[in-house]
Amino acid sequence: MPSSNNKDNFLDKAFTVIAEGIVKMMPIAAKEKQAYIYYREGFAAQNNGDYSEALENYEESLKLEENAIDRGETLKNMAIIYMSNGDEDKALDTYQKALEQNPKQPSCLKNMGLIYEKRGRALQQNGKQDESDIWFDKAAEVWTKAVRLYPGGYLDIENWLKTTGRSKVDIYL
C-alpha cells in the first residue's frame, strides 16, 4: 500500500508542477491567475477532505475572480462543502448565490432539491403532511429546472416528479 500512496503523491506533485507552468503561460491577468490558483488549491483540499482549507482558498478566489461562471463554480463547490457538513441553510444560500452568477448549473438545482425533499420527508414522517407538501413542491420546482437544463441526466429525479404527480414537464428528453 505505501508504494501506491507514493505513486499517487508523485502524480499529484507532477500534476501541480505542470498546472503551475500552464497557469504561468496563460495569457490572462495576474489577478485572474491568482484566483485560479486559489480555486485549484481549494478544489484539491476539498478532494482530500480538508474542508476548512478548501473554504479558505475558495474565499480568496472569490475576492479576485471576476468571471461570473467561474465565481458560480466556486460558490457551488463551497455549497457542496456546507451540505456535506450538514449546514443545509448555508448550503441553500450559497447554491442560490452560485445560480445568480451562473443560472445554468443543474447540479446546484439538483442539490437544492435534495435538501428540500429531505425536509419534506422528515415532516411527512412526523405526520405533518401540509408542511411536507410545501417542501416537496419546492423540490419539484428546482428539480424541474434541473431536468430542463440537463435532459436525461437525472432519471431518478424525473421518476420522482412523475410518481409524485409534481411533474410539469411532459417530455424530458
Swiss-Prot record:
Compartment(s) where it occurs, according to its Swiss-Prot or TrEMBL record: Cellular thylakoid membrane
Gene3D superfamilies hit by this protein: Tetratricopeptide repeat domain
UniProt keyword terms in alphabetical order: Membrane, Photosynthesis, Repeat, Thylakoid, TPR repeat
Ranges in coiled-coil conformation: none
Pfam families attached to this UniProt entry: TPR_12
UniProt TPR repeat ranges: 35-68, 72-105, 120-153
Location, primary (coarse class): membrane
GO cellular component, one term: plasma membrane-derived thylakoid membrane
Protein topology in the membrane: Peripheral membrane protein
InterPro entries: PSI_Ycf3_assembly, TPR-like_helical_dom_sf, TPR_rpt, Ycf3/AcsC/BcsC/TPR_MFPF
One biological process term in Gene Ontology: photosynthesis
Family, as annotated: Belongs to the Ycf3 family.
Function: Essential for the assembly of the photosystem I (PSI) complex. May act as a chaperone-like factor to guide the assembly of the PSI subunits.
Descriptive protein name: Photosystem I assembly protein Ycf3
Lineage: Bacteria, Bacillati, Cyanobacteriota, Cyanophyceae, Synechococcales
